[in-house]
Amino acid sequence: MSTSGAAAAIAPEPQHGPGPVATADDEVITWAEFRAWERQLARTGACSRPIRLRGTSAINTASGEVAGGVLHVACGNRRETACPSCSALYKGDARQLVRAGLTGGKGVPESVATHPCVFATLTAPSFGPVHARRMRGKTVLPCRPRRDSKDWRCPHGRDISCPVRHVDEDPRLGRPMCGDCYDYEAAVLFNFHAGTLFKRFTTYLPRHLARLAGVTRKKLRADLRIRYVKVAEYQARGIIHFHAVIRLDAPGTGYTLPPPRYTAATLCDAITLAARAVRLDAPAGPGRPRVRLGFGPQTKADPIWRQPVIASGQPLDIDAVANYIAKYATKSADVPGLPGTRIRSAAAIVALRCPAHHKRMVAAAWQLGSPQATGDPRLRQWAHMLGYGGHFLTKSRRYSVTFAQLRRTRAEHRRLERQGDGVRDPWGRPLDDTIVLVVNDWTYAGRGYAAPTPGAQLALASADRARGR
């Protein structure tokens, strides 16, 4: 395995400093040991569980010295529960990616800010009544109040009314009023096919936009391109919905303003119509061959930039949109109480320590993915994600900068920082290309920090405090 930058990553720490350091357990460590661990943490961005590589970095052909050992590489996990540090880095990149497509920067011209742009939310339909926090302005409304004298009991005899004004932290939010009435099969199938539904939405959107603008589809393709970035988010009921920034550009590789007939108001209306048109018949379990899926009626589209006519709502704040999408690009990748890895057996589902509602969704995905069912066998692969197996942040090719470009820029910046005092070899001496042979030969050695030494514990505590700030 070849790893760039490995030579600098295992450079030995100079043996000098103010003296020994005492840990919380009164264990004395040397300043050099603490600084060595601190440098390791800095190189991995204080990663919680880095990848450990063992091998050789370089060879001094004159002296025979070999630079090698254990190299720690950041895990790069974007899940907030798996690694707060790598997740925070991913969140920052996501924010820059979204913001660049709204205001310019990172190679995108600032003129993109004048383009028609909309923040859209596509939700799932109802699969049964659930507890919800309902608002009117800033007032919290009763969840499901009884408004007439009809019987508010379901076919199973359960009361499906709820007069409670739920708070944000109420654990009942998203839970069905009656678990036996709730359509768990359809809910899991919606999650599984959510990516396909969004793809169909992007197919229907240009058609409806052309009709509303009074042009043919061919003329629309000649006039503009639709760029977007979207993030998937779990609702409290465990169902995926999408938030998307959708922008109109003229054709070509640049970021040119499209013709003035295509406004944000027209785009808002087209988004609503396209979402209503999406339909997908998915195979289900025995005795129920097909389930018709589509987006719910609560599709929302709001302009981000002011246009001559605004279809609905008020223009949204750019920072709020960028921060919102970046937040859920990392947070939504986790389902509370469920493992981050695949479930291997039905017995593992029984042992899950999560809300009963989520456990029933996992069980439904497992059952639909069984060889006896008519569903897709990949449902078992994504049972721990309640059926959803797609990416949580995706974008069209030319919306803005890419994650890879941001990472390359950051790596180059760090390389230049390290070279500020002159290029040095792995032994801390001025680099002599004629005698230092760079090898960079590494093999996988494990996960996590190599040894829980006092220096490691103290450095990790420092990293935790830094993340807290």
Regions found by a protein language model. Give the residues of each.
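Long, contiguous juxta-domain segments that are non-catalytic but functionally important
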Residues: 70-117, 122-159
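Histidine-centered divalent-metal-coordination microenvironment in nucleic-acid enzymes
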Residues: 83, 120, 220-253, 325
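Acidic/histidine-rich catalytic neighborhood
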Residues: 238-244, 278-311
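Long, low-complexity, charged/polar intrinsically disordered accessory regions
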Residues: 1-91, 295-469
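Low-complexity, serine/threonine/proline-enriched polar segments
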Residues: 141-182, 286-288
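A short, contiguous, amphipathic alpha-helix enriched in charged residues
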Residues: 191-223
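Catalytic micro-motifs at enzyme active sites that drive phosphoryl/nucleotidyl and oxygen chemistry
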Residues: 68-72, 105-110, 214-236
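Helical (often loop-to-helix) elements that flank the catalytic cores of nucleotide-handling enzymes
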Residues: 245-287
